Amino acid sequence: MDTQTPQNQIIPIFMSFDKNYALGASVSLYSLLSHASRHTSMIDFSPLNQSNQLLGANIVYKIHCLIKGVTLEQQNKLLKTLEPFRKFASLEFIDINSLDHSIESYLNESCSKRYGGLLVLCRLLLASLFPNYSKIISIDVDTVFLGDVASAYFALDNDPTKLLGMVRDTFSHLPFEAFCDFIERTCKNFKIDFSRFSQNELQRIHQGFNMGFLVANLDLWRENGFEKIALEFLKTRGKDLFYPEQCLINMVFWKRILELPIYYNCYSDFFKEHYPKNIIMLHFIQYKPWRSVSSLNGRLICYEAEAGFWLANLFCTPFKNDFFKERLEMAKDQQMQSFKTHIRSKTIRDYFYFRIKNILKKVFKLS
């Protein structure tokens, strides 16, 4: 289906998460819509190095969240998160219980429990989940947006042979031997037979792409029966896959993936290297800003500069009080000496300086 009308260009966005990631989803959604273009004429295609010609139209973002165990209270807070953007965005929840869970049985049990089973495999089913869409963007929720996502929706238009648009995974930065050592250890932890992987399969995963951000050509998925191909592969090799859906995509469809610039999925480890360039999505691939005491060389994740962007967006969502309540409970439980040790003084000072400066601007403008 063509999702553009003379009045509106629809851009569908998909994410999947459970109740533990609802707060992260709120921050991801708020930051995404804060930077999102509202008209096709406003889209900046420079990150893609493309010059797409689009019809003039207002952009409407239709967000679909596949949820597992997310409470009604959390759902209401997510809906409130979108209220400032209600003129050009909508939110729909899809309960995971409405889907067929049988494909989870194809996975290694430990991997399924660790990575969410159907919550990650669902990205292989987007073409059948959304039969009325020709394309869709899928994002992880451990993210914060610093730029406009709209350009990615049109990334595949100039190459109709490509099935997906994705950013290369961090594995590609490792020497191949070091990568294989890491994967062998990972397989051992999950009791997976490492020898089941061919050299070619390992090379594809090594030079493969990350599922944290992707744009999918759903028409191409349907025309070529790629969903059936993916599920058949899952039946025969699913128990070998340590990162289930990502390994599958890279092992089976690697040649059909368009490489997107790292700006669309900039891993937190590379933040300092790429900021303040055109970072569009910052991805906390290891340490999550909302987790309690995730340490990195003795420091907490909120010590990291990039977490400041996440916090600034959190303060604009209905989940901010939940975050502070949890931090205070942690202090009572003596997991931290004080809230100050969790978010360093400079982060707090910078935030309040930013707020005070904005308040003063408004005051002087009124006077």
What are these regions (language model features)?
Residues 1-367:
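Glycosyltransferase catalytic domains, chiefly GT-A lineage
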